[in-house]
A protein has these predicted regions:
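Conserved beta-strand hairpin/beta-sheet module of binuclear metal-dependent hydrolase folds
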Residues: 1-48, 142-145, 151
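Active-site neighborhood of divalent metal-dependent phosphoester bond hydrolases
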Residues: 79-81, 88-116
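Short, well-ordered amphipathic alpha-helices
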Residues: 66-72, 93-99, 144-145
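Metal-dependent phosphodiesterase/nuclease catalytic metal-binding core
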Residues: 116-175
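Active-site metal-binding motif and surrounding structural segment of the metallo-beta-lactamase
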Residues: 39-88
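Short solvent-exposed loop/turn micro-motifs enriched in small/polar/acidic residues
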Residues: 20-24, 114, 172
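Short glycine/serine/proline-enriched coil/turn segments at secondary-structure junctions
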Residues: 44-47, 102, 136-138
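Generic structural signal for residues in well-ordered beta-strands
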Residues: 15-18, 109-112, 129
Length: 175
C-alpha cells in the first residue's frame, strides 16, 4: 500500500483508531471496523475504503483533502461518499466542489449532509452518532459514536438466535 501520509494507530478493545493530527497542518482519523472517518485535512490512500466521514469544522487543516477524496472515489468507481458537516458549511462546500469540478472537468459526487449540535444520526440499527457543539473560531461540532444495544430479558437469555427471532416475529417483546 502506498504510504503517502503519516498514520498513527491505537487499538482499544475491538476497535482501531487510525490517523494523524497536527494543529494547523492536517487532521484525519478513522475507525476502519465501523467504516467511519473524521476530518479530511489530508487523505492517506489506505483510507479510500472509508465511505462515511464526519467533518468537525471548515478550517483547511480539517477539509483540504475533501475534494481529492471525492475525486479519487469517483475515479476508482466507488460509491459516492457520505459526508456530514456543520450545516453552516454545506452551501459553501457545494460551491467549492462545483468550482473544483469545473477545474478538474470531472464530477465530484458525494452526499453532503448538514448537522447541528444535538443531532442523533442513526447509521444502522445499532450504530449511532450524536453531535455536540464545540467552541472554536468557526462553527464546529464534535461527534460521539456509540452502539445501541438492547439486552435480552433474563427469561430469554438461554434461547437460540432462531428462537429469539421466532418470538420477535410472533410479537413477543424479548428485550
Amino acid at each position: 500500500m502506498l504510504k503517502n501520509l503519516p498514520v498513527k494507530k491505537l487499538v482499544h478493545g475491538d476497535l482501531t483508531i487510525e490517523g494523524y493530527s497536527r494543529a494547523a497542518v492536517q487532521t484525519y482519523w478513522r475507525i476502519p471496523e465501523l467504516k467511519l472517518g473524521f476530518d479530511l485535512g489530508a487523505h492517506p490512500w489506505g483510507f479510500m475504503g472509508t465511505p462515511t466521514w464526519f467533518i468537525s469544522h471548515t478550517h483547511l487543516d480539517h477539509i483540504a483533502a475533501l475534494p481529492v477524496y471525492v475525486a479519487r472515489r469517483r475515479m476508482m468507481k466507488m460509491e459516492p461518499p457520505t459526508i456530514y458537516m456543520p450545516e453552516s458549511a454545506i452551501e459553501m462546500m457545494e460551491r467549492l466542489l462545483q468550482c473544483f469540478s469545473r477545474l478538474d472537468q470531472g464530477r465530484l459526487p458525494c452526499k453532503l449532509i448538514p448537522v447541528a449540535a444535538g443531532d442523533e444520526i442513526e447509521l444502522s440499527r445499532e450504530l449511532v452518532v450524536t453531535t455536540a457543539a464545540m467552541k472554536h473560531r468557526v462553527k464546529s461540532v464534535g461527534y460521539c459514536v456509540w452502539r445501541r444495544r438492547s439486552k435480552l430479558k433474563s427469561e430469554y437469555r438461554d434461547h437460540t438466535g432462531d428462537q429469539i427471532r421466532d418470538l420477535r416475529l410472533s410479537g413477543v417483546d424479548v428485550s
